[in-house]
Each structure stands twice: as C-alpha cells, then as structure tokens.
Amino acid sequence: MTEELTKFASVSEKDVTRAIVGEFARQFMQYVESDVIIVGGGPSGLMAGRELAAQGHRTFIIERNNYLGGGFWIGGYLMNKLTVRAPGQEVLDELGVPHEEVSPGLHVADGPHACSKLIAAACDAGVKIASLTVFDDIVLREGNRVAGVVVNWTPVAAMPREITCVDPIALESKVVIDATGHDAQVARKLEERGLLKTVGFGAMWVERSEDLIVEHTGEAHPGLVVCGMAVSTVYGLPRMGPTFGAMLLSGKRAARVAAASLAGIAK
C-alpha cells in the first residue's frame, strides 16, 4: 500500500512575509499600552505574567534574549536538574511538572520540563512577549510614578557606537514589574535619578534568602513592583543559588501586588 503524500497549502513567500509582519505589528500596537509590563522573562517574571494574564490583565513581557526562562532551564553548574524547597513544589504541581522529594522538603525536577511548562502556562494564560527587546529606561509621570518602559532591539547594543543612532521607543503601562534578576535593571534606573536606593545582593544563604525574597516582594516605588532576585539586589538580601521555590512564589506575590495596584488605579 502506497503512503499518501502530504500536500501543503499553496502559499507564496510574500504571503509568509505579510503574515509575520502584519501579525507582529497588530499585536505590538495592542500592547504599546498595557496594564502590566514585566521586564525579564525568567521564572519569577513568567510566573507573575501567568497569574496576571489569567485574571484578564493585559500583560506584556519584555525579554532581551530570543528565548524565555532565564536560568530555569538549568539547575546549576550546567546540570539540568533543578531544586525547589517546600512549599514551592505546589507550583510544580499546578503546572503539571513531575518532581521527586529527595529529602524532607527538597524536591528535584527536570529543568527543561519545568521551564517549558511554565512558558506554556504563561502563554496559555494570555501573556504576550517581546523577544530580543532590551530595557533601556523608564517612563515617569506626576510624582515620579513609573508609567512604562523605554525599549530597543537587543542587537542594537552590539552595533559600533559610532553608527548606533537608533532611538528607542516607549511603551506605557499602569504597573511595571522588575524581574531582571540580580541586575535589577529597572530599579537601578530609578537609583540613577536619585529616586531609589539599592543595596546590592548579599552572599549565598539558601534558608534565609528564599523566605526574605518572598517577604520583600512588592512595590519598591510607585508604579514599580520588584520580584525574584531583583528583590535581593534592591534590599541587600542573601542570594539563594540554584533553588527556585522563591522565584516562583515571588512571582505569584508580585502578581497579587500588581493586581491590587491596578484595582486601586481603577477606583
């Protein structure tokens, strides 16, 4: 019996190009003004985005790389097993990620499985993403409230300075979440203007770090919520190393804080 050959639809090169450009432009135009812009598509940013989008908030993630997930793909030392301390495994259960309790309160999962599930969950919830888009600056309004971000294409930063006359563009939002990890890039732009003081992250101390990072996740400045390792940098908290429970729970807490801020603005 001869196998029937697949016959693809008749589509030309111009049709493909128009589809890419048209749909990108349509989506980008919608998200030039968002409820929440999240800078950084690592585990805490993705978690915050998933929670907010699931509540119906227009949520846009800005990611400088051409991939999402940050360090969530690899648990540490180039090994792709990641650890989560209880109660963080409850998020893995929510996402449908298999994990094993290897000692009391310490769970291990496959990094690629966990990361891909989180990315899919964020996308399924309705989060939209601008990849290869680098954060450049903040937008401020009355009272120095953060009201958006200034962005550019990531490859622009690699161009020789003498030919890099490529102005960035601005995106507006009601709330911005800094999920840029240890760099705390959004918070540091406020610091450059004397509007916020960051301390810098401390040395590794897993047991102290995770509790403190979730506890301190919140609004660091009007319109700006910090989550994940950016919290450590802003408040001088210990780093946690290759364990991810606090990243996930910090993202959830950031979403609650942002949602409360949006509700207050609506009033």
Language model: regions and residue ranges:
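Glycine-rich Rossmann-fold phosphate-binding loop(s) that bind the pyrophosphate
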Residues: G40-S44
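Glycine-rich FAD pyrophosphate-binding loop
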Residues: I37, A53-W73
